[in-house]
Design a protein with these regions (language model features):
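Short coil/turn segments
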Residues: 38, 92-93, 129-134, 155-160, ...
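A ligand-binding cleft/hinge motif common to bilobed small-molecule-binding domains
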Residues: 94-104, 168-172, 199-233
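Hinge/capping helix and adjacent helix->loop/strand transition within the periplasmic-binding protein
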Residues: 76-85, 100-187, 236, 249-283
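N-terminal (or domain-start) structured segment
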Residues: 21-111, 150, 174-201, 210, ...
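An extracytoplasmic/periplasmic, membrane-proximal ligand-sensing/linker region
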Residues: 26-28, 238, 260-322
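N-terminal signal peptide c-region/cleavage motif recognized by signal peptidases
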Residues: 16-18
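Bacterial N-terminal signal peptides that target proteins for export
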Residues: 1-9
Length: 322
């Protein structure tokens, strides 16, 4: 009798799970973007939202909740109902860096947020102001060594991923640079173009048009191979500094406790969207980014390694926000 009851219960649960996946989404879905409108993450989020709206027949809305190095947006999603209707477009600070940079967070990135799909990575390019008398990485390094602490670089703020990346670049190159923190890439790149600061590490996408127009000078790309949209920009290895590799990544996470069937559906349908030729050309490889497309299990494994890497880097750089 007990065995029969258990079998019936399992069957009912299986049917319920399948039905849940088939009926989701039954109402509008929110994608929370932890940055202001118009930036790289926002554009990506809106591109995915538009395609998922078509696929699901339900509106997928983007909400911008910028501030506090993505903490505001992450807390909102972590404390939302675990039903799949609130999705965070997270990046490496959200899930890997902030827990080591801040002594207290209002969310636990491991316990409170569940990986869905790792979408893409954005490898950085070193850009300098066009008037700077350095046309190669080695010329820049020589200039920095001759003028220690004088050359300036911009980042998204103290303790940001771009801050850590540039500190690591300085250590590997044996140079000392002067840090000028900004609020985001929308402030950093104009400062480089105007000569307010000398250089910055940037994702390719927001810098691409200005590199092509000559308003920014690109000296090195931090990937294993050259980027197809910047074929004349050497890798750091080609430029004489092997081993320097930096990247940011973007992926979906949901509140812990979200049904597995809903997570799998979001992952599968997002994968369909991002692997089309049209989407890739408009939002990924066509603007200098690289597809990752890792499902929930692979994404979780990736995060374990990424967190360990950030723990080491924060310790070595000796930078903390509080």
């Amino acid at each position: 009798m007990l065995a029969r009851f258990v079998a019936c219960t399992v069957a009912v649960l299986a049917l319920a799970s399948g039905a849940l996946a088939q009926t989701y989404p039954a109402k509008p879905v929110r994608i929370i973007v932890p940055f202001s409108a118009g930036g790289l993450t926002d554009v990506l989020g809106r591109g995915i939202a538009n395609e998922l709206t078509k696929l699901w027949g339900q509106r997928v809305l983007v909400e911008n909740r910028a501030g506090a190095n993505t903490i505001i947006a992450a807390e909102l999603v972590a404390k939302s109902p675990p039903d799949g209707y609130t999705i965070l477009l997270a990046n490496d600070p959200t899930l890997s860096l902030n827990q080591y940079m801040y002594s207290k967070l209002p969310y636990d990135p491991v316990r409170d947020l569940t990986p869905v799909i790792n979408i893409l990575q954005s490898v950085t390019v070193l850009v300098v102001t066009p008037s700077l008398a350095a046309n190669t990485l080695q010329e820049l390094i020589a200039m920095a060594k001759a003028r220690p602490g004088e050359l300036t670089y911009g980042t998204f703020g103290y303790g940001s991923s771009t801050h850590l990346d540039t500190l690591e670049l300085g250590t590997m190159a044996g140079i000392k640079l002067n840090h000028i923190p900004f609020k985001g890439i929308a402030e950093v790149l104009p400062a480089v173009m105007s000569g307010q600061i000398n250089m910055a590490l940037s994702a390719v996408a927001p810098a691409l048009a200005n590199i092509r127009s000559g308003r920014l000078k690109a000296l090195a790309y931090a990937g294993a191979q050259r980027n197809k949209v910047l074929p004349n920009v050497p890798t750091y290895a080609e430029a004489g500094l092997p081993g320097f590799f930096t990247h940011g990544w973007f992926g979906f996470v949901v509140p812990a406790g979200t049904p597995r069937e809903v997570i799998e559906k979001i992952a599968a349908d997002t994968s369909k969207v991002i692997t089309t030729r049209e989407f890739d050309e408009k939002f990924i490889s066509g603007v200098g980014m690289e597809l990752i497309n890792q499902g929930p299990a692979e994404y979780a494994e990736f995060l374990v390694k990424d967190r360990a890497q950030y723990a080491r880097r924060v310790k070595e750089a000796n930078v903390k926000q509080d």
